[in-house]
Amino acid sequence: MSAAPAQAHPPSRLTLYRQLIRWDRPAGWLLLLWPTLGALWLAAGGFPGWHLLAVFTLGTVLMRSAGCCINDVADREFDRHVKRTAERPVTRGAVSVKEALAVGAVLALAAFALVLTTNALTIALSFPALAVAVAYPYAKRCVAMPQAVLGVAFSFGIPMAFSAVRGGNGAWGLAALNAAVPWWAWGLLIGNLFWVLAYDTEYAMVDRDDDLKIGIKTSAITLGRHDVTAVMSFYQLYLLAWGAIGFWQGLGVAFAAGLAAAAVQVAWHHTLIRDRSRDGCFKAFRLNHWVGFAVFAGIVVDLGWRA
């Protein structure tokens, strides 16, 4: 008699949780990290100190991971109809809804504990930041461009970085916000929102056929045949906003080199998405964090030369 085939062991809870928070896909939290750290350096006029660097780096990773838990719970009925997401732990039933929410809550509380080591204004800003992050998955049901909601969520680290550096007097009202977060910091937020629109529209282009069938809204569907043109316009607005503000703040040659490196990558991304292939669009999205890194590196080097 032939031996019965050995049954594969089910994945451990730790393995499932790692899948839930996309631990093997750091591109997601890197997309949040570079603009947040860029704002931190600009707010401080250079190196912001190890404490704030640790708070915002760890906080970014934790909140992005918590966001994955919330997103997978909210989208579980949709995800089973999408090729790319059908095997996510919550969608396939390997992790329960309550379990995923518990993991997300623990991660969010850990991030909040880090925020508590900053100041009152930054703590206050963390609440609307959380609200927007929670709202994003549900925006896909009723907003034509839900990527704009994601753009606000992914950009909220910018005003929080300024408040952490400049809002240390204990006040947390509107006057304190205006004093700690200048108008040009909000300009950085708006510019970064356009970057999010660019790369998340590329991401939405991957799933467009599936999304049309299940009836959710995305920027790729809303933009239709103008999607590639719109993505390139979003990139240009992002680089224009950050470039104008950076030069206005006195950044020079190194920052210009960072912008140029980012622009070269954007031009390459156009070659990846112009035919709207799934593989090309997904590759452009997956490598997009290098665009943000180029801008961040230009800021760091330029401010470092001043020191």
Swiss-Prot record:
Cellular component terms per the entry's GO annotation: plasma membrane
State the species of origin. Methylibium petroleiphilum (strain ATCC BAA-1232 / LMG 22953 / PM1)
**What keywords tag this UniProt record?**
Cell inner membrane, Cell membrane, Magnesium, Membrane, Transferase, Transmembrane, Transmembrane helix, Ubiquinone biosynthesis
Q: Which GO terms describe its biological process?
A: ubiquinone biosynthetic process
Q: What protein name is recorded for this chain?
A: 4-hydroxybenzoate octaprenyltransferase
Output the Gene Ontology terms for molecular function. Answer: 4-hydroxybenzoate polyprenyltransferase activity
What PROSITE patterns does this protein's entry cite?
A: UBIA (PS00943)
What's its job?
Catalyzes the prenylation of para-hydroxybenzoate (PHB) with an all-trans polyprenyl group. Mediates the second step in the final reaction sequence of ubiquinone-8 (UQ-8) biosynthesis, which is the condensation of the polyisoprenoid side chain with PHB, generating the first membrane-bound Q intermediate 3-octaprenyl-4-hydroxybenzoate.
